[in-house]
């Protein structure tokens, strides 16, 4: 195909595994953006222009830097058609910059920890978002079930009520390698299913359902944060 993927992901990152499958299934091309260019957003944009990149799937950090430097006022991306992002929260103010500068590009926010093999929810951004409004993580992906459970393991259905996001479906990992205690704590029997064994993954992420019935990420129940798509436990000391 004529599409070109602009890949910023390390080869061990889950986003790269998706890009690789897309590359083989669609017959498109891939441009591997060197790691050292991450500190030079202008060079990245020039590479996207030169290689006529039509699809990017990035952790938002570099996109935030591009927005803060107002680089899209100086450089256009005429070949870009699809822009997906995942791995950390994309501040809506900086996202709106991209959305307004590239009105013909389709944007999507994807969410999913590595334990469920890439992503379990998606949100195609087809409406205006206020700068102070968080970008929803949206709706379940195919073959994925999403449960929002309260502190009593009851399902949250009402709007604007917080609970822990739990995932079920075909994409779940079998557990953590050589760590049965951590596996037993995170991969548990679905408390809503009393009929047969059904494992769900407890993400530790706190979410709620807004008035549009979209899932919105609120925060963590622990001290874990994500930076550049990598997990960092703030409670750990060296």
Question: What spans do the regions from the language model cover?
Answer:
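Alpha-helix capping/helix-boundary segments
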Residues: 61-63, 90, 172
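AMP-dependent adenylate-forming
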Residues: 106-109, 124-238
């Amino acid at each position: 195909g004529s599409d070109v993927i602009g890949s910023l992901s390390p080869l061990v990152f889950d986003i790269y595994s998706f890009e690789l499958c897309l590359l083989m299934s669609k017959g498109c091309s891939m441009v591997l953006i060197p790691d050292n260019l991450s500190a030079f957003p202008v060079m990245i944009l020039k590479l996207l222009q030169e290689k006529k990149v039509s699809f990017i799937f990035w952790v938002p950090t570099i996109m935030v830097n591009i927005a803060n430097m107002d680089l899209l006022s100086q450089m256009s991306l005429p070949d870009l058609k699809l822009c997906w992002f995942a791995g950390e929260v994309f501040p809506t103010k900086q996202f709106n910059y991209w959305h307004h500068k590239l009105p013909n590009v389709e944007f999507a926010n994807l969410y999913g920890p590595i334990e469920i093999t890439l992503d379990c929810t998606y949100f195609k951004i087809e409406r205006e978002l206020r700068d102070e409004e968080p970008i929803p993580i949206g709706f379940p992906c195919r073959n994925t079930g999403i449960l929002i459970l309260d502190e009593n393991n009851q399902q949250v259905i009402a709007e604007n009520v917080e609970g822990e996001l739990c995932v079920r479906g075909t994409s779940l990992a079998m557990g953590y390698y050589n760590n049965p205690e951590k596996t037993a704590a995170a991969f548990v029997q679905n408390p809503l299913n009393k009929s047969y064994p059904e494992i769900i993954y407890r993400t530790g992420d706190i979410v709620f359902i807004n008035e549009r019935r979209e899932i919105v990420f609120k925060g963590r129940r622990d001290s874990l944060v994500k930076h550049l798509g990598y997990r960092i436990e703030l409670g750990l000391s060296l």
